[in-house]
Amino acid sequence: MIPLIALLLTMSSQPATPYTSNISLSSQHVRRDFVPDGDLDKGVWRLVPHATFEHNFTGEKRYPELKTEVASLWSDKYVYFAFWCKYREINVYQGEDPAKERWGLWERDVVEVFLNPEPAKVNHYYEFEVSPNNQWLDLEINLDKKPFNDAGWNSSFEHAVRIDKERHLWMCEMRIPLSAMKTRIVPGSQWRGNFYRAEGTGSDEQRSLLAWSTVVARPEAFHNPSRFGVIRFVP
């Protein structure tokens, strides 16, 4: 029998995980790469698991009229994400060139993917945003630096959107190069990440801010990596 003091010392020497969320999404492997076109009715998305969220980022309010679904696929070169977003009204920047990166995109309707391919480096991750009119933003995040968001980083991720006005549904498809994050995926890989959505006009207090894995209400609340969920890459 191991002496109690030795057992306690052994337990204390094992690093505790910094993550406090166990929510997970499975990302399935796809053999053939494809370019995003915003059509989420195509066969590749029909049988993959979906994660659904309709609560605000703290989990205290629910917005069933803003039901959001997200799914993921991966290949040897890319990780893909698809969003289905119920909406009330569309709020976007008007008359701008969607080919150009848009700083402050989070102040309009947007879906956001936060990805950490190296979970041991809790404060280092990547952010990808797309709006209903296909404007975009990508950032490398390092919370140990000031400023913590590097807008000069360019992932060359591809994205496309479609809006179904009859169903009050806007859809987004993303394809993110693994090389941009200096990583690769094999079956069994596990990343950390979160999915967010912003909807509505006015201040943050007036808008609807949703999260897949809930976070603590605080300044820069979305940047709370200890609350990132698990993305499991399966065959």
Task: Give the positions of each predicted feature.
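Sec-dependent signal peptide recognition
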Residues: 1-7
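Structural preference for beta-rich elements and adjacent junctions enriched in aromatics
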Residues: 13-235
